[in-house]
Amino acid sequence: MNIGIVGTGSIAHTMAKEFARPTTMPVVAVCSRNADTGIAMAHEFNIPISKVYTEYDEMLADSEVELVYIATPNSLHFEQAKAALLAGKHVLCEKPIVPTVAQLDELLSLAEERHLHLLEAITTIDHPNYGLAKLFAKEIGDIKTVSCTFCQYSSRYDAFMNGQTPPVFDPAYCGGALMDLNIYNIYFVVGIFGDPKAVHYYPNRHANGIDTSGILILEYPNFVCQCTATKDSSAHNSAQIIGTEGSILIEPGSNNCQKLVVTRKGKEPYISEISDTPWRYEVIGISNFLIVPQDTVKERRIRAMRSAVAVLEAARKDAHLDF
């Protein structure tokens, strides 16, 4: 399925490298507001210069483009995804796909009406070790606590502290630690345990209102989950599920389930280490789904997507983040 990419930031380049591996998803076009960055990306990934667009509508009119990969600031996702679906294109949108459940439901309805696929690009759900974690979570007894940490000092934080406002720290672009990083922790948790019964978010705010870091609490009937994400500091990242009969440890965190360690009473530890990039498995999972779109896989993806967006929306409401 031929891909047109909108956006030329770091994640667009990362995904383009994965698409460039032998897959069924070649990149045939790129759209950037800046022609120079679009041309540079075209040269890097052997995209014809004639397929470099500075107007999104022009790329959507390109009949060779079958799927649009959206890698732009969060606040642009809804309108760009809607336009792509209306143009008859499948959509793969970077996380978080949209800020609200209402927007997501509108896009899902539109995709269903037009027999198109709407997918969210996130590394967690297609990683083999995450699949193992879901299975082993049933073997460690009653769950008592869950904790996920994704702390990553942003490459744009110093500029932000010096008076600039990059999109990742701009409320107008739906930036911040919750939307950018805690989304991985949310996906990790809801994909295993389903919807929480209550959501609370405790952010550290900058003067402009953005959350540069924060702790998200997800309450389940029999346990509480803590999800920590920071863009203003760094730490050792991991995801841990602790039960009465054992525990599951994922490192280096919910966005990259590279190492899985399972300990169970009376059994030898189970360890799985995977060296390939998490984006590799993301692209493989998406590619396999598009080749053979099974209803059960589609339903699971939609359920996880909707649960994650619902948590994001509830967390922002709880913390009075007005975007």
Language model segments and positions:
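Predominantly a Rossmann-like dinucleotide-binding segment in NAD(P)-dependent oxidoreductases
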Residues: 127-197
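Rossmann-fold dehydrogenase core element
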Residues: 106-124, 142-145
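Short, conserved SAM-binding/catalytic segment
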Residues: 40-49, 106-113
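N-terminal Rossmann-like dinucleotide-binding module
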Residues: 1-46, 290, 321
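Beta-loop-alpha module in the N-terminal Rossmann-like domain of NAD(P)-dependent dehydrogenases
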Residues: 50-108
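C-terminal helix-rich "cap/oligomerization" subdomain common to oxidoreductases
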Residues: 67-69, 105, 285-323
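Hydrophobic residues in well-ordered beta-strands that form the structural core
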Residues: 93-94, 118-120, 250
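Contiguous beta-strand/loop segments that form the cofactor/metal-binding neighborhood of enzyme cores
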Residues: 185-255, 284-293
